[in-house]
């Protein structure tokens, strides 16, 4: 099955917007992404997810929430949209809502490390340190040398008053 020319053009526009985002030209990215508001639902979901991310980075939580909810409406399996929505909830101090949203994102995409990481942070915000530690330990199995994950595990052990196991156990070497 051949890819339709309008679909190729839309994909190119998405990539153009992402390039603007990487260059931190958020105004240009927003302008490109807003052009998707009347297009195909799948592409609109991707554009809305990116808009949500941009608005969150700019501190416009109301717009970030609006576009995250729009992206989720157009694509119910969009874990990244849920992560963006959870980020807004977390930033607003709505830790319980954020936990639910990050859990849903992790259920939609079990490989979404952002959902698991942010779920751990939301549990920390709720002072549910055992669940937070469980999230970061799960991440350590996926990303064993990630400094942020190791830091959060050590920080949680400090807060809980328990000694942490060495995240870098001695390894034998031979030539």
Model features per residue range: what roles?
Residues 7, 41-42, 76, 110, ...:
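Short coil turns that delineate tetratricopeptide repeat
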Residues 22, 57, 91-92, 125, ...:
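Register position in tetratricopeptide repeats
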Residues 36, 70-71, 104-105, 138-139, ...:
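Canonical positions in the second alpha-helix
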């Amino acid at each position: 099955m051949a890819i339709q020319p309008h679909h190729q053009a839309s994909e190119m526009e998405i990539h153009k917007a992402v390039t603007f985002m990487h260059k931190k030209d958020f105004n240009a990215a927003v302008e490109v992404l807003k052009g998707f508001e009347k297009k195909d639902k799948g592409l609109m979901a991707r554009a809305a997810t990116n808009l949500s991310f941009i608005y969150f980075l700019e501190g416009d939580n109301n717009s970030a929430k609006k576009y995250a909810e729009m992206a989720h409406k157009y694509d119910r399996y969009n874990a990244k949209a849920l992560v963006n929505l959870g980020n807004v909830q977390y930033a607003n101090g709505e830790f319980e809502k954020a936990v639910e949203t990050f859990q849903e994102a992790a259920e939609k995409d079990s490989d979404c490390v952002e959902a698991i990481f942010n779920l751990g942070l939301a549990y920390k915000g709720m002072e549910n340190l055992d669940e937070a530690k469980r999230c970061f330990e799960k991440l350590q199995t996926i990303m064993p040398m990630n400094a942020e994950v190791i830091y959060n595990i050590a920080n949680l052990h400090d807060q809980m008053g328990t000694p942490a196991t060495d995240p870098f156990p001695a390894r034998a070497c031979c030539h």
